[in-house]
From Swiss-Prot:
This is UPF0102 protein Franean1_1156. Belongs to the UPF0102 family. It comes from the Bacteria. It holds the Pfam family UPF0102. PANTHER family: UPF0102 PROTEIN YRAN.
Length: 118
Protein backbone atom coordinates (compact mmCIF):
# COMPACT_ATOMS: atom_id res chain seq x y z
CA UNK A 1 0.00 0.00 0.00
CA UNK A 2 1.40 3.39 -1.00
CA UNK A 3 2.03 6.15 1.54
CA UNK A 4 -0.89 8.20 0.18
CA UNK A 5 -3.20 5.18 0.49
CA UNK A 6 -2.09 4.57 4.08
CA UNK A 7 -2.65 8.24 4.91
CA UNK A 8 -6.12 8.10 3.33
CA UNK A 9 -7.05 4.94 5.23
CA UNK A 10 -5.79 6.53 8.46
CA UNK A 11 -7.95 9.61 7.81
CA UNK A 12 -11.05 7.55 7.09
CA UNK A 13 -10.53 5.57 10.31
CA UNK A 14 -10.19 8.80 12.31
CA UNK A 15 -13.25 10.30 10.58
CA UNK A 16 -15.37 7.20 11.29
CA UNK A 17 -14.40 7.30 14.98
CA UNK A 18 -15.19 11.03 15.07
CA UNK A 19 -18.64 10.46 13.58
CA UNK A 20 -19.37 7.56 15.94
CA UNK A 21 -18.30 9.60 18.96
CA UNK A 22 -20.71 12.31 17.78
CA UNK A 23 -23.58 9.79 17.86
CA UNK A 24 -23.67 8.71 14.22
CA UNK A 25 -24.14 5.12 13.09
CA UNK A 26 -21.75 4.17 10.30
CA UNK A 27 -23.77 2.43 7.58
CA UNK A 28 -21.04 2.01 4.97
CA UNK A 29 -17.37 2.75 4.44
CA UNK A 30 -15.81 2.99 1.00
CA UNK A 31 -19.11 2.19 -0.70
CA UNK A 32 -18.38 1.61 -4.38
CA UNK A 33 -20.28 1.39 -7.58
CA UNK A 34 -19.10 1.63 -11.18
CA UNK A 35 -19.21 5.44 -11.02
CA UNK A 36 -17.00 5.88 -7.97
CA UNK A 37 -16.83 5.68 -4.20
CA UNK A 38 -18.38 7.36 -1.18
CA UNK A 39 -15.99 7.39 1.78
CA UNK A 40 -18.56 7.11 4.58
CA UNK A 41 -22.35 6.84 4.74
CA UNK A 42 -23.76 7.42 8.21
CA UNK A 43 -27.07 7.96 9.97
CA UNK A 44 -27.19 10.68 12.59
CA UNK A 45 -30.63 10.71 14.14
CA UNK A 46 -33.11 11.36 11.33
CA UNK A 47 -30.38 12.46 8.92
CA UNK A 48 -28.55 10.39 6.33
CA UNK A 49 -25.04 11.78 5.92
CA UNK A 50 -22.78 11.23 2.91
CA UNK A 51 -19.21 12.04 3.94
CA UNK A 52 -16.15 12.86 1.91
CA UNK A 53 -12.93 12.52 3.90
CA UNK A 54 -9.85 14.55 3.04
CA UNK A 55 -6.65 13.73 4.89
CA UNK A 56 -3.77 16.16 4.94
CA UNK A 57 -0.28 15.65 6.33
CA UNK A 58 0.23 19.40 6.67
CA UNK A 59 -1.14 22.79 5.73
CA UNK A 60 0.73 22.78 2.41
CA UNK A 61 -2.12 20.99 0.65
CA UNK A 62 -4.89 23.43 1.55
CA UNK A 63 -8.15 22.87 3.32
CA UNK A 64 -10.17 19.68 2.80
CA UNK A 65 -13.51 21.40 2.15
CA UNK A 66 -11.88 23.57 -0.51
CA UNK A 67 -11.03 20.38 -2.42
CA UNK A 68 -14.69 19.30 -2.66
CA UNK A 69 -16.31 21.74 -5.05
CA UNK A 70 -17.72 21.77 -8.57
CA UNK A 71 -17.38 18.44 -10.34
CA UNK A 72 -16.22 16.59 -7.23
CA UNK A 73 -19.32 17.68 -5.26
CA UNK A 74 -21.58 16.87 -8.22
CA UNK A 75 -20.02 13.39 -8.51
CA UNK A 76 -20.66 12.70 -4.82
CA UNK A 77 -24.29 13.81 -5.23
CA UNK A 78 -24.68 11.40 -8.18
CA UNK A 79 -23.16 8.60 -6.13
CA UNK A 80 -25.57 9.38 -3.30
CA UNK A 81 -28.50 8.98 -5.70
CA UNK A 82 -27.13 5.55 -6.65
CA UNK A 83 -26.73 4.60 -2.99
CA UNK A 84 -30.31 5.68 -2.28
CA UNK A 85 -31.58 3.59 -5.21
CA UNK A 86 -29.97 0.51 -3.65
CA UNK A 87 -31.10 1.32 -0.10
CA UNK A 88 -34.81 2.20 -0.06
CA UNK A 89 -36.55 3.95 2.81
CA UNK A 90 -33.90 6.54 3.64
CA UNK A 91 -34.50 9.20 6.28
CA UNK A 92 -36.22 12.36 5.13
CA UNK A 93 -33.15 14.53 5.65
CA UNK A 94 -29.99 14.07 3.59
CA UNK A 95 -26.77 15.97 4.19
CA UNK A 96 -23.34 16.12 2.56
CA UNK A 97 -20.39 16.62 4.90
CA UNK A 98 -16.66 16.98 4.47
CA UNK A 99 -14.38 15.75 7.22
CA UNK A 100 -10.82 17.02 7.04
CA UNK A 101 -8.25 15.08 9.01
CA UNK A 102 -4.97 16.90 9.59
CA UNK A 103 -2.02 14.81 10.72
CA UNK A 104 0.53 17.24 12.10
CA UNK A 105 4.28 16.66 12.09
CA UNK A 106 4.47 16.31 15.87
CA UNK A 107 2.00 13.42 15.61
CA UNK A 108 -1.16 15.19 16.74
CA UNK A 109 -4.38 14.79 14.79
CA UNK A 110 -7.04 17.42 14.23
CA UNK A 111 -10.49 16.85 12.68
CA UNK A 112 -12.51 19.59 11.02
CA UNK A 113 -16.10 18.52 10.36
CA UNK A 114 -17.99 20.76 7.96
CA UNK A 115 -21.66 19.76 8.05
CA UNK A 116 -23.72 20.54 4.98
CA UNK A 117 -20.56 21.42 3.06
CA UNK A 118 -22.28 21.27 -0.33
Amino acid sequence: MRVSQRLGRFGEDVAARHLSADGAEILARNWRCRDGEIDIVARHGDTLVFCEVKTRSGADYGSGPDAVVGRKAARIRRLAVRWLAEHPHPPAIIRFDVLSVYRERQGSVRVEHRRGAF
